[in-house]
């Protein structure tokens, strides 16, 4: 059996809904509150909207589908900020016979605001999303979490964190009149890697 080393959780941070129990009756208003609650990241795959079409391309996802549970269409506790890929893949899939029955056996979905989500999905050392359990495998395939774009966007994000930190360090050294040549070289290299991943993303979307 192939050994998988888990290095990281699927998401940088577990999101929390700040407006539990509240209902705004437009998705536009809900989305304004969902974006910061979810750190401008897809609830399921953690893609940042920064390199992925921005706020306008992200969707308001209904955990329990609104086609089956009309009364939950604007219930904040049922809503998620989601990339179009996960939202469209999930569509109106729902295994249970009522709104509270999101899992039956090894099939179904878990709300990523729930701790249990992180027991079923993770990331390997390269940033690929991996399933950890049979239920995780169901979610992985149903949401198409195997798409290459998720791996590319994760790495773009990680490289960008390093790029920004290096830039800040160079600025700090410059202010103290220190030699920055080595750091500038590393920064240039990191920028080149960033561009390589960006090209990959553009190719993937073409
Ligand atoms: Zn997503």
Functional labels for PLM-detected ranges:
Residues 2-44, 69-71, 77:
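Short, charged surface segments at domain edges that flank catalytic/cofactor-binding sites
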Residues 28-32, 115, 164, 181:
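Generic alpha-helical secondary structure signal
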Residues 42-45, 83-86:
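Short cysteine-rich clusters marking metal-coordination/redox-active sites
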Residues 47-79, 90-105:
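Histidine-centered nuclease catalytic patch
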Residues 90-165:
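Domain-level detector of nuclease and nuclease-like folds
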Residues 138-206:
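C-terminal, charged low-complexity interaction regions
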């Amino acid at each position: 059996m192939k050994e998988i080393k888990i290095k990281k959780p699927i998401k940088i941070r577990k999101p929390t809904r700040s407006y539990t129990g509240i209902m705004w009756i437009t998705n536009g208003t809900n989305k304004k509150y969902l974006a910061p609650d979810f750190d401008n990241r897809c609830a399921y795959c953690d893609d940042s909207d920064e390199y992925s079409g921005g706020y306008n391309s992200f969707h308001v996802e209904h955990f329990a589908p609104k086609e089956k549970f009309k009364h939950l269409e604007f219930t904040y506790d049922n809503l998620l900020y989601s990339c179009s890929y996960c939202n469209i893949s999930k569509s109106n899939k729902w295994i249970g016979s009522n709104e509270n029955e999101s899992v039956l056996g090894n099939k179904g979905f878990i709300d990523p605001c729930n701790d249990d989500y992180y027991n079923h999905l993770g990331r390997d050392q390269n940033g690929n999303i991996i399933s950890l359990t049979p239920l995780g495998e169901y979610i992985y395939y149903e949401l198409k979490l195997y798409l290459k774009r998720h791996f590319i966007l994760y790495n773009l994000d990680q490289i960008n964190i390093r790029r920004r930190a290096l830039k800040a360090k160079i600025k700090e050294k410059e202010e103290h009149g220190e030699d920055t040549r080595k750091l500038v070289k590393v920064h240039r290299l990191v920028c080149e890697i960033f561009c390589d991943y960006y090209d990959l993303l553009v190719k993937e979307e073409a």
